[in-house]
Every structure is written in structure tokens, then in C-alpha cells.
Amino acid sequence: TSADYSAITTWGVFGDGLGPPNLCLLGATRGRWDYPTLRQKAIDKFEEHKPDSILIEKKASGQSLIQDLRMAGLPIFEFQPDRDKVSRAYAITSLFHNGRIYAPQSKMWTKEVMEEARTFPTGNHDDYMDTISQALLWMRNGGYIDHSENTWLDKAEQRVYNRKQVEQAKSKSFYY
């Protein structure tokens, strides 16, 4: 079962000037971590990628993590699921079908993430898919992706995150 695992994914949002912004999976890790280890992993990933936002599911250990990381000054946002995992995954499939999701071929974790996505929801694990659907829904609902042309074009530069990492990953990437 996947309940024993915690997963962390890091995303970059980038535009090419020809359409709505795309997303690149910049990092993924999962494990069975006790709370102090989970907290340190979250801080380490923040230091590694310097994201503008950290999204944490507000249940189980996530509640304590939200409080601790906010007190540490990190840019925390809560995610409260309002539907089941399969429904959330279904809600983001158009982003994959439209070729808007990138992932680097050269990273060890890419194969693991892709295998989990391929076998979801009947596979052995769903931890990455849970973080992926939460992140993509949050970015779409928050206006970071799926803008109308008039909205996103004049704000494109403000919405590009982790530009250097995204460009490096994009040069060695494939469409999901």
C-alpha cells in the first residue's frame, strides 16, 4: 500500500511564448520517513530548488509539517483534497495529452515516476501520482497554467519559475 510512503515532487512552470505555460518535473523522491526525516527532506528540497511555493496536503503528518515549515519561514500552501485520487488524476489528464508536461530522461527517478503513472490506479504505489495531481490542480486553479492568451502573455515573465533548472531539464526532456 502507498499509505506508508511520503513523496515530494518539484515543478517548474515555463512558457515558450507560443502558447500557454508548460510544466517540468524537476525532482521527485519518496520514502518511508519518520517525521524528523520528512521535515528535513522538505527543507533540503526547498534549499535545492528554491521554489516560490510549497504545497503540502493537509492530513496526517502534513498538518505538523505545514506548521513547522511556516514557522521556519518557508512559503507554505495547504492542499485539502476535495475528491478522491482517481478523480484528481482524471482532472489533469488533458495536460499530459496536450504535451504540456516535461520530465528529464536523465534522472533516475523519472522511470519510477513514469511507471507509477502508467500503472495508476491499480499499481502498487500512488504517492507520486498523488503529489502530481495535487500540484497540477493547484497550479491550474491558482492561475499559473491554462491562462487565456490575453491573461498569460503579459504576465509570462512573472510566472516563470526555476528558469535555469527548467531550461536544463527541457534540453534533455521528453513529453509525458
Features from the language model and the residues they span:
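Short, surface-exposed amphipathic charged segments that create phosphate/polyanion-binding patches used
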Residues: R88-G99, E116-T119
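Residue-level detector of intrinsically disordered/flexible regions characterized by low predicted structural confidence
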Residues: S87-Y90, K172-F174
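Conserved helicase motor
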Residues: Q80-V86
